[in-house]
Every structure is written in C-alpha cells, then in structure tokens.
Design a protein with these regions (language model features):
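Helix-biased detector of long, well-ordered alpha-helical tracts
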Residues: 1-184
C-alpha cells in the first residue's frame, strides 16, 4: 500500500502532509505519480471513484471463508497461500520440483492498472509485487473445487480455478495474462 500511494499520488500530498513520508527518502521518490486524492478514476461500467478512495479502500477478509473450508476439507487441502506480501510468486517459497501455471487469473482490478500506469512498472514486476486482484490460493484436489467455490460465493466473494500444478525438475511459476507470459 505504501508503494501504491507513492506511485499514484503527486507531490501535493507531501506538501500538505509532510508527516506522511520518511524525510530520509530522496524527494524524487516520494509521491511521484500524477494523481490527487480527488481525481476521478474510471473503474468500468461507466462508474468512477476518487483516486484516494480507490487506493485506500478496505480489503475484505477471507477468514469466514477459510474457516468454513477448513471445517469441511482440512485434510484435503494441499496448500494455502495468502498472496499479499509476495504476490503471485509467493508460492515459490513453499514448493520444490513443481511448476505452478496460472493461466486463468481474475481480471486485473482498476487499482493495479492505475499503479502500473502511474509507476511505469512492468507487468512482470507487477505480478511479482502485487496480488493483482487475488489474494488467496488453495491447492486442492479437483473433486472439491466446486464445493470451495460455492463456499466462497456464499460470502459474495468470487472464486475460480486460476491454474494448475505440474511436476517439474525445479520450482517455477508461470503466469499467462493479457499482458504477457511471465516465468519466475
């Protein structure tokens, strides 16, 4: 979130709120984007939201979903990865000799498109740094996939199969997105 704020918002934030950044950081790196808090951002379907609300909007918790999934399927879950703090490559910390192929990802939300546009960060780096709209991965057998999707949807949280796992000579993640194929 700190990176997003500095990548998206302009220097007027630093001038108005000098306590919002560490004075030891080079000035050219702080609030280097072009947006103000009140700039309208297109979020699709003819709707807009201010940049401030978009960047600072709360994140829903997965706790109720995960509790219900664990209550019913704990012994069938092969892995769970919360993609914050490691993004789409975080799973690399937990595997050996597996290839994780993510080729059916959710659409990238407007917030991450805005960060990409403002920061000029490559899409490959975006998937390595940000969750890109999906924060939780469950690695489960095909037989229980629909049950888990149904549980998630009962809490009005979208869920879908985003890829698959294959054996490999080494650990690897491949992301296939509208913005390219990236191998980590």
């Amino acid at each position: 979130l700190t990176s997003a704020r500095h990548d998206v918002f302009n220097k007027s934030i630093a001038e108005k709120y000098p306590e919002s950044y560490d004075a030891a950081i080079p000035y050219e790196l702080i609030f280097s984007g072009s947006k103000s808090l009140t700039d309208k951002i297109d979020i699709g379907n003819g709707q807009t939201i201010t940049a401030g609300k978009l960047v600072l909007s709360p994140t829903r918790t997965y706790a109720p979903v995960i509790k219900q999934v664990l209550d019913g399927y704990r012994d069938q879950i092969h892995g769970m990865v919360h993609c914050s703090g490691g993004a789409q490559t975080k799973v690399l910390h937990f595997i050996d000799d597996l290839h994780i192929i993510k080729d059916n990802l959710f659409p990238v939300p407007p917030l991450f498109k805005l960060i990409h546009e403002e920061s000029k960060t490559s899409w490959q780096e975006m998937y390595k740094v940000f969750n890109m709209g999906h924060r939780m991965e469950l690695y489960v057998p095909q037989e229980i996939v629909q049950d888990i999707i149904d549980i998630s949807q009962s809490f009005n949280i979208d869920a879908q199969v985003i890829g698959r796992v294959e054996t490999s000579a080494h650990k690897q993640v491949t992301i296939r997105s509208p913005y390219g194929e990236f191998v980590y």
